[in-house]
Amino acid sequence: MANNEESRGLKSLFDWFANRRKAGATNPERQEREIADGLWHKCSKCGVLTYTKDLRANQMVCVECGHHNRVDSDERIRQLIDQNTWRPMDENLRATDPLQFRDRKAYSDRLREMEDKLGLLDAVKTGLGQINSSPVALAVMDFRFMGGSMGSVVGEKITRLIEQATQRRYPVVIICTSGGARMQEGMLSLMQMAKISAALERHRDARLLYIPVLTNPTTGGVTASFAMLGDIILAEPKATIGFAGRRVIEQTLREKLPDDFQTAEDLLKHGFVDDIVPRTQLKNTLSQLIALHQPVPTTPPMVLWETMSLSSTAAE
């Protein structure tokens, strides 16, 4: 098995070098520098080396084994939203440190480090846009920012997005990836579960569509709240989805869990998600679902109305 993976990886590498030789001679030092600079990506599942440009063209899905690599919020928005239609919301909301929380370092220092490293103020981006010309309110969680944990800013931004969608009568799509509620904010982070759920209930009362997309991983308080409240719940292949961690459950039950436990495929089998959609098909799938749930026009077509009027006149 390992030999086959190495062979596939070497074949891909040789093909690329062969193409480069056709385009023009390069020296070994330049080739090594290009690999080190991120021109190549090694799949964590099958070990195949893929030209990063080709991997991005395939939405960061391994062309050999189909493994879905983790992507950031900007890449998600690029993949899903029609060009030049994205309008971000609440970009300047920033977390505070009301508990003066400190573990190995102060929470305020962690927030500052994340901002400096990633250019993000928190773990979600929200906004309005279009998916194949259909308007949508979209929230995209970003696992790079403190494990995608849900704090007061994440909760507030998602709640405001849902309220705006309800007012505009837009469907809501949330791309979920999270380790759960943010412990550094204590009860304030747990309150976001109820706040978002209440906003979604008002959205549902208005007979509007909500679709969560569960990606790897979706766990903790996010799973226990808005991730599982969708009208239609989608998941990416092989995504880890659950509440408590696998090791915690095994230690509590003192039992060995099945290999597919807490996977998207296992949840689909037991009815917790409605479908598993490969990332390359996600935009079109969302577009079709949104189109199917558009409200039926209440005004009769003009031709039908004219026919009814003529019939009424003739009868008189």
Swiss-Prot record:
EC number: 2.1.3.15
GO molecular function: acetyl-CoA carboxylase activity; ATP binding; carboxyl- or carbamoyltransferase activity; zinc ion binding
Occurrences of domain CoA carboxyltransferase N-terminal (ranges): 39-308
PROSITE patterns recorded: COA_CT_NTER (PS50980)
Cofactor binding, note field: Binds 1 zinc ion per subunit.
Binding site for Zn(2+): C43, C46, C62, C65
Keyword Lipid metabolism belongs to the record: yes
Subcellular location: Cytoplasm
Cofactor(s) the protein requires to work: Zn(2+)
Zinc finger region(s), C4-type: 43-65
Catalytic reaction(s) noted: N(6)-carboxybiotinyl-L-lysyl-[protein] + acetyl-CoA = N(6)-biotinyl-L-lysyl-[protein] + malonyl-CoA
UniProt KW keywords: ATP-binding, Cytoplasm, Fatty acid biosynthesis, Fatty acid metabolism, Lipid biosynthesis, Lipid metabolism, Metal-binding, Nucleotide-binding, Transferase, Zinc, Zinc-finger
GO terms under cellular component: acetyl-CoA carboxylase complex
Signal peptide coordinates: none
Annotated pathway: Lipid metabolism; malonyl-CoA biosynthesis; malonyl-CoA from acetyl-CoA: step 1/1
A Gene Ontology BP annotation from the UniProt entry: malonyl-CoA biosynthetic process
HAMAP family the UniProt entry points to: AcetylCoA_CT_beta
NCBIfam families tied to this protein: accD (TIGR00515)
Similarity comment: Belongs to the AccD/PCCB family.
Role, per record: Component of the acetyl coenzyme A carboxylase (ACC) complex. Biotin carboxylase (BC) catalyzes the carboxylation of biotin on its carrier protein (BCCP) and then the CO(2) group is transferred by the transcarboxylase to acetyl-CoA to form malonyl-CoA.
Subunit-structure text: Acetyl-CoA carboxylase is a heterohexamer composed of biotin carboxyl carrier protein (AccB), biotin carboxylase (AccC) and two subunits each of ACCase subunit alpha (AccA) and ACCase subunit beta (AccD).
This protein's name: Acetyl-coenzyme A carboxylase carboxyl transferase subunit beta
Species of the source: Trichormus variabilis (strain ATCC 29413 / PCC 7937)
Taxonomic classification: Bacteria, Bacillati, Cyanobacteriota, Cyanophyceae, Nostocales
Protein's gene: accD
